[in-house]
């Protein structure tokens, strides 16, 4: 998909345009697998740019449950697992990935390297770095056998980050250099950006290049964005949509303005706000409730 290729190069606006074209082409024609692939990109893009997926992950899952298709749910599980792993939210990763039960799922051979790469990202989010290192040789052999160069690039980057966190700096630098060499011809920056926090000490030791400069630029921007969007523990009971509404309320947007921003009805926003206050056990008049909500939002995660 062209949108995916543009995203991997860090061209977020162009990727967003192509993503919307892809959604427009498949809308209403039953190509659910393609729609789920688009969703996977949309959620990763939302971590890097002002892109709001049409449905929250929870809403998407509810829609898929009504269609009783296990393979579609497995794709959703993979998307949610990777997204929450990138956000550093291991507690929100779906059970299938959080408990590493992929072996219980029938995955067709062409999809297996990608699924295993997702699981690697989950292991990293859980701090299981030795697992990532231990799996890497087998995963890279699988990727080579199937000519999955992009997945192999992700695995090398993940393994470099794991080695670095384990204090194995020599091994980490060797893998990073190979990954940089693999990514440079096509300007593939996102595998590095998505693992930027674990690569910062390694990148600082490398001779600067256009590729490294771009990785650092996007990685730092991603860090700042993640810090702005971090969810305080006091708000952990909220769904993605509810937390999104809380952030917009903190910007002093009215219910009508929030509805316009999220393509909801004003009535739906009012219902969400009511649910938010109920879940957080916030009482009082409107001004008091908003002030208390802002206090919770500003609390340390």
Q: Each predicted region: which residue ranges?
A:
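Linker/hinge segments immediately adjacent to helix-turn-helix/homeobox DNA-binding domains
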Residues: 116-125, 129-134, 138, 144, ...
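Recognition helix of helix-turn-helix DNA-binding domains
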Residues: 244, 252-291
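Short helix-capping/turn signature of helix-turn-helix
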Residues: 4, 250-253, 299
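Alpha-helical repeat scaffolds
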Residues: 13-24, 51-64, 89-103, 129-140, ...
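Alpha-solenoid helical repeat architecture
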Residues: 1-2, 10, 26-41, 64-80, ...
């Amino acid at each position: 998909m062209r949108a995916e290729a543009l995203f991997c190069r860090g061209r977020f606006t162009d990727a967003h345009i192509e993503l919307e074209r892809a959604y427009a082409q498949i809308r209403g024609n039953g190509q659910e697998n393609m729609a789920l692939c688009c969703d996977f990109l949309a959620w990763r893009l939302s971590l890097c740019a002002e892109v709001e997926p049409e449905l929250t992950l929870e809403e998407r899952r509810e829609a898929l449950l009504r269609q009783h298709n296990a393979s579609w749910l497995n794709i959703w599980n993979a998307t949610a697992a990777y997204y929450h792993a990138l956000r550093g939210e291991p507690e929100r990763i779906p059970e299938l990935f959080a408990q590493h039960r992929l072996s219980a799922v029938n995955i067709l051979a062409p999809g297996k390297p990608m699924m295993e790469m997702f699981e690697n990202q989950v292991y990293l989010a859980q701090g299981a770095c030795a697992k990532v290192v231990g799996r890497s040789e087998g995963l890279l052999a699988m990727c080579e056998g199937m000519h999955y160069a992009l997945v192999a690039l992700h695995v090398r980057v993940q393994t470099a980050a794991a080695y670095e966190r384990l204090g194995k700096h020599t091994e980490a630098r060797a893998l990073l250099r190979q990954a940089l060499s693999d990514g440079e011809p096509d300007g593939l920056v996102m595998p590095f950006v998505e693992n930027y926090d674990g690569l910062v000490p390694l990148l600082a030791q490398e001779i600067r290049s256009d590729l490294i400069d771009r990785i650092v630029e996007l990685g730092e921007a991603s860090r700042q964005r993640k810090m702005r969007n971090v969810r305080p523990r006091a708000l952990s009971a909220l769904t993605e949509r509810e937390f999104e509404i809380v952030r917009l309320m903190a910007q002093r947007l009215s219910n009508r303005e929030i509805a316009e921003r999220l393509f909801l009805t004003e009535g739906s926003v009012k219902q969400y706000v009511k649910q938010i206050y109920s879940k957080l056990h916030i009482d009082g008049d409107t001004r008091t409730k908003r002030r208390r909500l802002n206090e919770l939002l500003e609390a340390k995660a």
